[in-house]
Amino acid sequence: MFKSDPTENWTAKDFYKEASNALYSGEFESAIKNLETLEARFPFDPYAKQAQLDIAYSYYKFDEPDAAISAADRFMRLNPRDPNIDYVYYLKGLVNFKRGTGILDGWFPRDQAEHETETLHNSFNDFATLVRRYPDSKYAGDAYQRMIYLRNELAQHEIKVAEYYLSRKAWMGALNRAKIVVERYEHSIWRKRALEIMVIAYNELALPDLAADTQRVLDLNQDVASNLVNFDTELEKPPESSWYKFW
């Protein structure tokens, strides 16, 4: 004899209330289960759209970044004009920020390092989209500060690789990596070191004119003040739509 389902007669509101209680209690797996069941049983209920947003957040809190990104992308695809799209961009940026930062704390195999920098680029791009499209968003200020941080992280990665090439006397490799910092991350705190590496590489490659030109730029270069901030990767629960309350 089959056991009856205790949620058989639940409404969308019941599932959402249960999921919200689980979220606030830190029971993210339970929250995900209830939210996904809600959406599956009541796909056209107003609570279903809120559930889609909360699913992305719940996966983020459950340390499932791929699932969080997938859920966030799905929400934007299904609700392109939703007033909470700025939050979704912020969530996506934060997911990749959380899993991408720290790559420069040590050495990693080349493929892994490049994958992690791609993650940081994705985070930067999501924050940039948020700042550009929603400059008045409550998340824009923090997103902009994270962009500054990410720019310096990405520049530092290139410097580390350039330094490695210098140690191996691979002058062209060092030069190319340093150029990336100067050209892509002009305002990063690593620009001065990049110019120094370029001077070394040009001299070793017997290109004295280019070395002299770069040295002149270096002499005029002003140190960029460090603007690194220790970020808390916590994120508040998604905003609830104003057109309903379940309490």
Where are these regions (language model features)?
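Acidic, polar-rich low-complexity tracts and alpha-helical solenoid repeat scaffolds
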Residues: M1-W247
